[in-house]
Amino acid sequence: MDYAMKSLSLLYPRSLSRHVAVSTAVVTQQLVSKPSRETPRARPCRVSTADRKVRKGIMAHSLEDLLNKVQDILKLKDKPFSLVLEEDGTIVETEEYFQALAKDTMFMVLLKGQKWKPPSEQRKKRAQLALSQKPTKKIDVARVTFDLYKLNPQDFIGCLNVKATLYDTYSLSYDLHCYKAKRIVKEMLRWTLFSMQATGHMLLGTSSYMQQFLDATEEEQPAKAKPSSLLPACLKMLQ
C-alpha cells in the first residue's frame, strides 16, 4: 500500500515539475562548469594585388578564414597564391604570426610567378610606361569640314557650310544655301561658275608667265647670233 502511494505521489504534477527543475539545474551547472573555448574575434584586414591597383577590406577571424575570403573576393579559385606583407614582402604562413600582427595590416596576394616589389619601383615603372604610351604631337596639314543644317524644317536639303583650314593658320569657308530645287540648281551653277572663273584666272596667269618666258628666250637667241655674223664680214674686208 505504501509503495502504491509513493508511486502515485511521483506521478503527481507538483512532484514531477520539482524533479524536472532539479534535473535542469544539474544539467545547467554541468554546462557552466565545463571550460568554454573562446573564438577569436574578427579583425579588419586590407588586401591588395601584386600591382597595388586593387585593394579590398576584409573581416577575418583567422588566417584560414582570410585566405578563403581572399579566394572568393578576388576570384582565385583553383589558382595557387601566397599572402605576404605589403610593406616588406614577409610571407604570412602561420596562425600565430597572423594573430601577432596589428589591426588594419596591409597584405598582398602573389600569384604563381609574381614577386613582391617596393612601391617606389612600381611607380617608376608606371611613369616610364605612361611616357612611352604618350601620343606624339601631330600637326594638321589640311582639314576640311562639312556642316549641313536647315534654317527651316520645310527646306528640301538645307544649307551646307564648307570650311577648309591649312596648317591651322589659313582658312576658307563657303556657305551653300539650298532652299528649293531651283535654288539648288542656281547655287550649283553659281558654284560651277565660280570654279570656272578661278580656273580661268589660273590658266591666264600661267599662260602669261609662259609667254613672258618664251619671249625672253627668243630675245636672247638673236643677241647671240649677231657676233657670229660679223666675223665673216671682217675677214672678207681684210682679204
UniProtKB/Swiss-Prot annotation:
The lineage of its organism: Eukaryota, Metazoa, Chordata, Craniata, Vertebrata. It comes from Mus musculus (Mouse). Its main location: other. Changing Q122A: Abolished ability to mediate lipid droplet fusion. Disruption phenotype: Mutant animals are born in a Mendelian ratio and appear physically normal at birth. Mice display increased energy expenditure, lower levels of plasma triglycerides and free fatty acids. The body weights of wild-type and mutant mice fed a standard diet do not differ up to 14 weeks of age, nor does food intake. From 16 weeks of age, the body weight of mutant mice significantly decreases compared with that of wild-type mice. When animals are fed a high-fat diet, the gain in body weight is significantly smaller for mutant mice than for wild-type. It catalyses: a triacyl-sn-glycerol(in) = a triacyl-sn-glycerol(out). One of its GO terms (biological process) is negative regulation of lipid catabolic process. Changing K53A: Slightly inhibits interaction with PLIN1. This is Lipid transferase CIDEC. It comes from the Eukaryota. Changing K115A: Slightly inhibits interaction with PLIN1. Residues 41-118 form the CIDE-N domain. Changing K186A: Abolishes lipid droplet enlargement activity, but not localization to lipid droplets, nor enrichement at contact sites. GO terms for molecular function: lipid transfer activity; molecular condensate scaffold activity; phosphatidic acid binding; phosphatidylinositol binding; phosphatidylserine binding. Changing K134A: Abolished ability to mediate lipid droplet fusion. InterPro entries: CIDE-N_dom. It holds the Pfam family CIDE-N.
